[in-house]
A protein has these predicted regions:
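N-terminal intrinsically disordered/low-complexity leader segments
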Residues: 1-5
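Helix-turn-helix
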Residues: 9, 13, 17-55
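Short, basic, alpha-helical segments at the C-terminal edge of helix-turn-helix-like DNA-binding modules
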Residues: 57-64
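Secondary-structure edge/capping motif, primarily at the C-terminal ends of alpha-helices
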Residues: 67-71, 100-104, 158-162
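Hydrophobic alpha-helical connector segments
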Residues: 68-96
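Amphipathic alpha-helical segments used for helix-helix packing
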Residues: 90-110, 121-124, 128
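Amphipathic alpha-helical packing segments from all-alpha helical-bundle domains
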Residues: 109-133, 141-152
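Hydrophobic/aromatic-rich alpha-helical bundle segments in the mid-to-C-terminal region
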Residues: 133-179, 184-187
Length: 187
């Protein structure tokens, strides 16, 4: 009898395989074979490789939700803790994470790019919630735009950060949050 697999098991195994093949070289048939399941069983859980990348980013979101933000005394500290936990969740596979994004950005993958924009928007909304940011009206719009820029800038820098424990990215995050505060957007 074949044991059913869940998406998280697939993500774990896909990451292991992609360590050898690169993300682009990862084949769903090879993933199924490595788990001793047939492709039909795999297709019940994921219908395309990008769903595995999305599940990987879902893990980062979950890590962010599970972070104890009570240690943050204000919105800026909570924001920093939330973003750090999101990045830390991806850190074990930083290079593969970058490869996943390259895959999404290929010219023929416009549908994946649109979904990626929605994911960024969703993550930014959660960051606002978790940090307790409560601006409304035009202040909220400015806050969301600035937070989107902060998040994507830090994330893109993190993708290429080779410093020990991504210390360069953490410095960039602190500087970006300081700018966010100076603009009066951290309320």
């Amino acid at each position: 009898m074949v044991m059913p697999v869940d998406k998280q098991q697939l993500v774990d195994r896909a990451l292991q395989l992609a360590e050898q093949t690169g993300w682009e070289g990862l084949q769903l048939t090879a993933l199924a074979n490595s788990l001793n399941i047939d492709v039909a069983e795999l297709a019940k859980v994921v219908t395309q490789k990008d769903e595995l990348a999305d599940a990987w980013f879902d893990r980062a979101d979950q890590a962010m939700f599970n972070t104890e933000l009570a240690g943050g005394s204000n919105a800026a500290e909570k924001l920093e803790l939330a973003i750090r936990s999101w990045l830390n969740a991806l850190a074990p596979y930083q290079q593969l994470t970058r490869q996943m994004l390259y895959y999404k950005l290929e010219p023929g993958h416009v549908h994946l790019q649109a979904a990626a924009l929605l994911r960024i928007s969703r993550t930014v909304q959660w960051l606002r919630e978790l940090a307790g940011l409560q601006a409304s009206g035009s202040k909220r719009i400015a806050q969301e735009l600035a937070l989107s820029a902060l998040f994507t800038t830090v994330f893109i820098g993190w993708l290429y950060d080779t410093s020990p424990e991504q210390t360069s990215s953490l410095k960039r995050l602190k500087a970006a949050i300081a700018t966010f505060i100076n603009l009066g957007l951290c309320r």
